[in-house]
From Swiss-Prot:
Signal peptide coordinates: 1-23
PANTHER family for this protein: ERO1-LIKE PROTEIN ALPHA, ERO1-RELATED
The protein's name: ERO1-like protein alpha
Organism the protein comes from: Mus musculus (Mouse)
UniProt membrane topology term: Peripheral membrane protein
GO biological process: brown fat cell differentiation; cell redox homeostasis; cellular response to hypoxia; chaperone cofactor-dependent protein refolding; collagen fibril organization; endoplasmic reticulum unfolded protein response; extracellular matrix organization; intrinsic apoptotic signaling pathway in response to endoplasmic reticulum stress
Cofactor(s) required, per the database record: FAD
Cystine pairs: 35-48, 37-46, 85-387, 94-99, 94-130, 99-104, 207-237, 390-393
Major localization class: endoplasmic reticulum
Record entry for activity regulation: Enzyme activity is tightly regulated to prevent the accumulation of reactive oxygen species in the endoplasmic reticulum. Reversibly down-regulated by the formation of disulfide bonds between the active site Cys-94 and Cys-130, and between Cys-99 and Cys-104. Glutathione may be required to regulate its activity in the endoplasmic reticulum.
GO molecular function, one term: protein-disulfide reductase activity
Length: 464
């Protein structure tokens, strides 16, 4: 036995020396390399690279953004989680504890936020809200003519066909305030056929894809023809290609969060949440996902650039003296607006912004139709969020789709923003409080995803 073992070791040594002599000795590939080897350099359809985004986000933006999102104005979000699914009836509700959402008690939400979720100032919040949609024109006669006109214009705009999302009726008895800090986005155990169906309907019916083209790794479809799919994708116009990449990037961002805040330990004493590298590998490893994982991560960076560009464009709206992050606490409101403007000016200084002028730049009639298709497809995706069986997943799905929809609304409203008056009501361009809260929280999710990728790079360095 000893002689045989010695012979085996000797043979292995000879093989190693031969490989070394031929220059073939290589260190084993790490999991970090398999997940991130393609997540570098310049992004498709952009002039920006991954490394610039990492440095800007992780060291200049992320810490300040997290501080802003912890403030009262941004942590409370009103949402209706009881809306029925408009597409199918057989929703299997997740019964796990971690799928549940704990709404706020009435006395937990600042009065300034509860009084009117779409108004920005103390003066505007004195306006009595109408009890029913049919009575929105019945404005308090004690208000000035200018204010009455502003309220009617806001309502008209908020109900207009320019919206990229199906907006919840926040006056509905089923709409409740949720503290986002107490209901964080993390792994809930919601998976399987129901979760697959949500994403399948989003990709198959809302991303401009014909049924004859099969998505890579599509559930239940057998082995995909990857080259066929990407040849089709590259043949699309830039707008439709961008649409797919935005949805893929959002999907990737959600999966990063589920891997970064995974339930590692669940006992009667405590729950321990943290990074699950195995879960991350299953979702993004280049070998395990047949090359799809790294592509999805690149799409996450593309999504980051789109929302970053929208925030840079909307700066004039927030700079107006009349705008406040109104909660009723004057000192805190002033500090939060100062921090908000500091963040937006930092974003404005980003050197490699996405150029949205390439969107809808052709024939006017064709561009108008394409923009409308773009809007309707995204609006439909926002409706699909009401079909998610996990309430916590539904909460964050609705918030993030509304946030991305708001970003798209901003990008396609550049002229309206440029023509806003420096003071007084803005009739042409308006953002509700719901849109503002979802916009910044959605970008906060993507910013956190980019930050978490750095953590996973380090954690996977020594994993093979």
């Amino acid at each position: 036995m000893g002689r045989a073992w010695g012979l085996l070791v000797g043979l292995l040594g000879v093989v190693w020396l031969l490989r070394l002599g031929h220059g073939e000795e290589r260190r084993p590939e790490t999991a970090a390399q398999r997940c991130f080897c393609q997540v570098s350099g310049y992004l498709d359809d952009c002039t920006c690279d991954v490394e610039t985004i990492d440095k800007f986000n992780n060291y200049r933006l992320f810490p300040r953004l997290q501080k802003l999102l912890e403030s009262d104005y941004f942590r409370y979000y009103k949402v209706n989680l009881k809306k029925p699914c408009p597409f199918w009836n057989d929703i299997n509700q997740c019964g796990r504890r971690d799928c549940a959402v704990k709404p706020c008690h009435s006395d937990e939400v600042p009065d300034g936020i509860k009084s009117a979720s779409y108004k920005y100032s103390e003066e505007a919040n004195r306006i009595e809200e109408c009890e029913q949609a049919e009575r929105l024109g019945a404005v308090d006669e004690s208000l000035s003519e200018e204010t009455q006109k502003a309220v009617l214009q806001w309502t008209k705009h908020d109900d207009s066909s320019d919206s990229f999302c199906e907006i919840d009726d926040i006056q509905s008895p089923d709409a409740e305030y949720v503290d986002l800090l107490l209901n964080p986005e993390r792994y809930t155990g919601y998976k399987g056929p129901d979760a697959w169906r949500i994403w399948s309907v989003i990709y198959e019916e809302n991303c401009f894809k014909p049924q004859t083209i099969q998505r890579p790794l599509a559930s239940g479809r057998g082995k995909s023809k990857e080259n066929t799919f990407y040849n089709w994708l590259e043949g699309l116009c830039v707008e439709k290609r961008a649409f797919y990449r935005l949805i893929s990037g959002l999907h990737a961002s959600i999966n990063v969060h589920l891997s970064a805040r995974y339930l590692l330990q669940d006992t009667w004493l405590e729950k321990k949440w943290g990074h699950n590298v195995t879960e991350f590998q299953q979702r993004f490893d280049g070998i395990l996902t047949e090359g799809e994982g790294p592509r999805r991560l690149r799409n996450l960076y593309f999504l980051y650039l789109i929302e970053l560009r929208a925030l840079s464009k909307v700066l004039p709206f927030f700079e107006r003296p009349d705008f406040q992050l109104f909660t009723g606490n004057k000192v805190q409101d002033a500090e939060n607006k100062a921090l908000l403007l500091e963040i937006l000016h930092e974003i404005k200084s980003f050197p490699l912004h996405f150029d949205e002028n390439s969107f809808f730049a052709g024939d006017k009639n064709e561009a108008h139709k394409l923009k409308e298709d773009f809007r309707l497809h995204f609006r439909n995706i926002s409706r699909i969020m009401d079909c998610v069986g996990c309430f916590k997943c539904r909460l964050w799905g609705k918030l993030q789709t509304q946030g991305l929809g708001t970003a798209l609304k901003i990008l396609f409203s550049e002229k309206l923003i440029a023509n806003m008056p420096e003071s007084g009501p803005s009739y042409e361009f308006q953002l509700t409080r719901q849109e503002i809260v979802s916009l910044f929280n959605a970008f906060g999710r993507i910013s956190t995803s980019v930050r978490e990728l750095e953590n996973f790079r380090h954690l996977l360095q020594n994993v093979h």
